[in-house]
A protein has these predicted regions:
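Transmembrane helix boundary and interhelical junction motifs in multipass membrane proteins
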Residues: 62-68, 94-104, 203-219, 247
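Predominantly cytoplasmic-facing regulatory/coupling regions of multi-pass membrane proteins
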Residues: 1-86, 132-203, 229-286
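Interfacial segments of multi-pass membrane proteins
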Residues: 107-115, 194, 198, 215-235
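Hydrophobic alpha-helical membrane segments of integral membrane proteins
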Residues: 105-106, 121-124, 132, 206-208
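Short polybasic/polar patches that bind polyanions
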Residues: 108-109, 180, 202, 209, ...
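Helix-loop junctions at the membrane interface of multi-pass solute transporters
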Residues: 70-72, 104-113, 127-128, 222-224, ...
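Hydrophobic, aromatic-rich membrane-embedded alpha-helical segments
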Residues: 81-109
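Membrane-interface alpha-helices at helix entry/exit sites of multi-pass transporters
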Residues: 79-82, 100-101, 111-128, 136, ...
């Protein structure tokens, strides 16, 4: 199934994205000093706030998975979480939103009824429209904070908008926690700008895992608000790192669940310890 979804076009886009990253890496005159200072600044980031951001990212994934489950009417909640997680895992490494295609295929396979592909396609479109509306509310809230009340009205529109709105709130909380971790003033207002910037960068996901583009979009959005380059880059790097690590962990668990491969308890314990150690290590490093 994955071979059909991750076709030659995706592989070419991935190669092009990696080539772009390699070019930047081999041209030290481009942002070398700023990037170096940004990584140094991450040493002073608050580990506690980064943990909070990780928890918020996890909540956002569960809410997004619930939106897909509501749209496709899957009976098994855990199964829906797992299928959504596999898409998150693919998006962590592949460009062009390949994870969404994987997600579409997995949910279509499990959707009830005769028109499985149509049901999954409607779910993808419905979630996308709801997410776009929520992003619009966030942009409006940067000028009129009272607009955030509109997110509270989402349950009136149905379960899908409700879960998408909840995921949006969780993403804003994650962004605010990252901003607080690196010392950005007014972290909540910053988060209201960062989340739409990330979604805009997602339209040009030509690099694997959108590496570089997402951090750059965050940095540009923060600089427009007067945040210095070093802090802006630190925020972008920290946000992408925590989100990616959470996505990989969530997706790996989903893949393991769907594969139904018998795994010894010692292996599960060992894998859990490795993931925990990697997470703690990353928090210490940044």
């Amino acid at each position: 199934m994955f071979r059909d979804i991750l076709d030659r076009r995706t592989i070419l886009l991935s190669a092009a994205g990696l080539a772009g990253v390699a070019v930047l890496a081999l041209m030290p005159q481009l942002f070398r000093d700023q990037l170096g200072e940004a990584f140094v600044a991450l040493e002073d980031a608050s580990t506690g706030w980064l943990w909070v951001s990780a928890a918020a990212f996890i909540a956002a994934l569960f809410c997004s998975a619930s939106a897909w489950r509501a749209a496709t009417k899957l009976p098994d909640r855990i199964d829906a979480y797992a299928r959504y997680g596999v898409g998150s895992l693919v998006n962590s490494f592949a460009p062009a939103h390949a994870g969404d295609a994987v997600r579409l295929a997995l949910f279509a396979k499990a959707s009830p009824g005769d028109h499985k592909c149509l049901t999954a396609g409607k779910a993808l479109a419905g979630v996308a429209v709801a997410r776009l509306a929520c992003v619009g509310v966030l942009l409006l809230a940067t000028m009129k904070p009272i607009a955030l009340v509109l997110l509270l009205l989402a349950p009136v529109l149905g379960r899908v908008p409700m879960w998408v709105a909840a995921a949006t709130v969780a993403r804003v909380a994650a962004a605010a926690a990252v901003a607080a971790a690196v010392g950005v003033p007014a972290p909540v207002l910053t988060a209201l700008l960062v989340v739409p910037a990330i979604d805009l960068a997602g339209l040009f996901a030509i690099t694997p895992g959108n590496i570089g583009l997402k951090s750059g979009a965050i940095a540009i959005a923060l600089q427009a608000q007067g945040v210095d380059m070093t802090t802006a880059l630190s925020t972008g790097i920290a946000f992408h790192a925590v989100e990616t690590l959470v996505g990989i962990t969530f997706g790996s668990a989903g893949t393991l669940y769907l594969s139904r491969v018998p795994v010894p308890r010692w292996a599960v314990g060992g894998a859990t310890a490795v993931v925990a150690a990697a997470f703690v290590g990353s928090m210490v490093l940044v």
